[in-house]
Amino acid sequence: MIKLKDISFTYENSREGESQLRHVDLRVEKGELVILAGRSGCGKTTLTRVLNGLCPQFYPGKLTGGYLLDGQDALKMPVHQLGTMVGSVFQDPRSQFFTTNTTDEIVLGMENIPLEQSVMQQRVKAVCSQMNIQRLLDRRIFPLSSGEKQLIAIASICAMEPKIIVMDEPSANLDSDAMVRLGVLLYRLKEAGHTILLSEHHFHYVCASFDRLIFMENGEISSIYSRNEALSLTEAQLAAMGLRPFQPSSFQVGGAFLSKPEDIFQVSQISCMLDGRQILEDVTFSAQSGKILSIAGPNGAGKSTLCRAITGLYRSMGTVRIDGEYLKRKQRAKKSFFVQQDADYQLYAPTVVDEFLIGKKESPELRQAALARLCEMGLEPFADRHPASLSGGQKQRLLLALAAESGRNLLVFDEPTSGLDGYNLRLTVKLLRHLASMGKSLLLITHDMDLIAEAADCVLYLEQGKLRYHRNVLRDK
């Protein structure tokens, strides 16, 4: 079905000798589900872009080697022909939307095939039922949460039923239930004969259905494991490879979190409406200095909206106090640092190191501090690179470093580890713990059970815009 022979690719304007893919040989048969694994920046996303034709037709660069798709030379195919054979779900779902309505978006690809209206209606009903997203039909796309957008992107591609489906971290922003449903959907597609390539850091939701795991390092395929071989790898072996365990960490919550008058951060009766919908309703909680609060809940529960409201990015009802002082919206924005889910919104400078110098008077000491922070997050080799050239996981780590260097006492992170491998997850946990030890108050919006288990002191759970519980995390001493 797919045959890559000696594929190498170098992006335009890359440094001399710097290739993103090096001599990749890979054969994938019809009906296989293959995981592409490896540390952030190892070349997984670039490989998916070669498979769907975006490299070099959309991302300019030098591509060498051979690529056969169903026996045809894919490198000579018109992009529209390749697009009918290979369906893609990108790392950032926003980059593949063409409409503003969810139902229109799911239908659009089928209209371009084209399919009969009755067939399209049947497929929309089937895929939305399998993914449990009927509630998202006929909604405006822009107000949706990142996880809900990801679900729409997945549904739009799966409804087309292409021969080959290439997904780049499709579970990054999904809650645990949605991940399970995605795993079931991929299993059904695989059983129906579709070929699936999955670039992922989270493996548990496809444990029962994947056939092989392709491990990449520095743009090369380092190892290929059968399903049994991959599942036999110990946690220590996976950690040495920079990968996460095949099963997510578990944790227990204890009694209710008890607020204290001296809590550094106090939120009272926050309510918010967006696009005519009640997103938050009377949310009240507090956080302590030196503690890490995880904000959890299903996709669309209002987690990101809550954090945008309390950091002053959204208008809302209710009050927020920091260090005992009531703060208006603009004051809250100055007192806090909010790391958004979409890293591109917060990166403006021409180089990575220059991100630390925005709005500051440059000095050797400031530059040295920035380089030290980059080194801490494994980003020092990219100091002079443009931020847009980084991988998704590298951009996330850059924003974590910027938050750490901001000097703010309230740090809020929206899915800070969604695109991170096991190695960089551990780096992130170490940094978060260090920031907490300095007396800062940290809020983490996350679906990542590994992050909650390793870093969180307490969990605040939202559902349908309401606070369901706020409890301490029980951890073995």
Residue locations for each model-derived region?
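ABC ATPase NBD Q-loop/coupling interface
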Residues: G66-Q81, T319-R332
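Conserved ABC ATPase "signature" region
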Residues: S118-L136, E365-F382
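Conserved ABC ATPase signature
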Residues: R140-L144, E148, H386-L390, Q394
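Hydrophobic anchor residue at the start of the ABC signature
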Residues: I154-A155, L400
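ABC ATPase C-loop
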Residues: C158, A403-A404
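Catalytic Walker B motif of ABC-type/P-loop ATPase nucleotide-binding domains
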Residues: I165-D168, L411-D414
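ABC-family nucleotide-binding domains
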Residues: D175, D421
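H-loop/switch region of ABC-family ATPase nucleotide-binding domains
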Residues: E200-H201, T446-H447
